[in-house]
Every structure is written in C-alpha cells, then in structure tokens.
Amino acid sequence: MIVTGGSKGIGLAIAEEFAKEGAAVSICARGQENLDKARELIETAGGTVHAKTCDVSDPGALQEYIESAVAALDGLNILVNNPSGFGRTDDEQGWQVGLDIDLMALVRGSWAAVPHIEKAGGGALIHTSSISGLTSSLRTPPYGAVKAAVIQYTKTQALQLANKNIRVNCIAPGSIEFPGGTWDDAKKNNPTLYASIQNSIPFGRLGEPNEVAKLAVFLGSDAASWITGETIAVDGGQML
C-alpha cells in the first residue's frame, strides 16, 4: 500500500498502523530527512517500507514515484492520498498550492494507481480531506474549497470504480495535533487561537494522528467491503 505525504503527522500514523497489520508500505514526501525518520519508525513497527522523495505537485515525478512503489511492493491494492499544501491565503499563490497539491496530486495519484489496483483484483482508495471541506472556512478559503472538491470527487470515483472492485472513501479529520504540525505551531505562537479550537471540541482536546489512522486501516480492510463513496469526520464532535 502507498501513502503520499507519509513522512509525518496523519500520513506517518497511517503508514505505521498499516505496517502493524502486516502491510508492505511505501511512503513519499518532499523532505529526505523526515522521510528517513519515518522509514525508521515504520520499520520499528515491524513493516517493510519503500520510501522516496517526491514533489507530488509535479505530475511526472508523482507518476514515477507510483511506478517505483508498485515495483518495490510487487503490486498495489491500497492508495492513501494524503498530501496537503494547506493553501491558506486567498490569493493566486494560496489557490494554486491548494489546487496543485490537495486536489490534482490526489487525482493524478489515483490515475497512476488505479490500473495497478485493478490488476491486483481490486482494493481501495482512501482520500484525506478535512472538516474544512464540510463547512465554511473563513480563515483558509482555498483549503476549504479544495477539500470540499476532494469529498465530491470521492463520490464520483466510487461510482466510476465499483465495477473494478475498487472502493473509494474519504476521511475528514478535525483539528489534529502532532509535532511540527499546524496546531503544534499555533499552541506555541498563537495560544489564543489554539485555546479557541480546543474549547470548541466537546472532549476538550485536539485529536491525535493515530485516531485518524485507525479509521484508514479499517477502510482499507475487508471489514469495510460494503462501504464506498463515504466521507467520515474524525473530529471528536468538533462540528456538532
């Protein structure tokens, strides 16, 4: 199985959880240092791992990565599309980052992976969206819009790929905290914002990456064989 954006945070947690279940895993990310650290963690979890640097906004590089991962894994049955450029600013650059990384990298990754998953007899695509795609996103308009597009595309893909025995589902995490992540930074540099988010969650805390990862493993498993086209929020009731 492949996880794009798999060197830290939610992506790394997903790769680790799949490795614990015995899956051979491939991850990609832009930075070699984080990728090397992630490889060590996944191997410690007992997994076989292929890791390669890749700028997923580059169509050729993404295609090359998918092909190298399939060769290293000797096939493919699960793709987790987890890249995020987190386009924050409501300007040309913010929108372009969101479109190139959050949306088109997911689309192109799917195009590259689907023939291999079909060849394996079927499997699953799992896309990472966000609760920002389910509601208004005043602070980050591009991010909310592209994450909403991911949710819609999930439904379309589910219909397109059912006859290939490929299920397509989407995870919409809420505010998830991990070292080096957005909310870790906010906790240190914008405690007022961090506290407001923390107080908006009924459980009084932010989520952890492994709480998202466990759902991804379920959606990739035979236990979810009759689930497709769904978007599931993992937010501790943040949107209630």
Where does each model-flagged region fall?
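Alpha-helical segment proximal to the catalytic Tyr-Lys
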Residues: P115, L159-Q160, S225
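C-terminal substrate-recognition "lid" of short-chain dehydrogenase/reductases
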Residues: R205-V234, M239
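Active-site helix of classical SDR
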Residues: S110, V146, T154
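Short, small/polar-rich loop/turn modules that mediate ligand/substrate recognition or access, typified
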Residues: A162, R167, I227-G229
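A glycine/serine/threonine-rich, flexible loop-to-helix segment
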Residues: N163, S175-S200
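Residue(s) in the substrate-gating loop at a strand-loop-helix junction
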Residues: S130
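Conserved glycine-rich cofactor-binding loop
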Residues: S7-G9
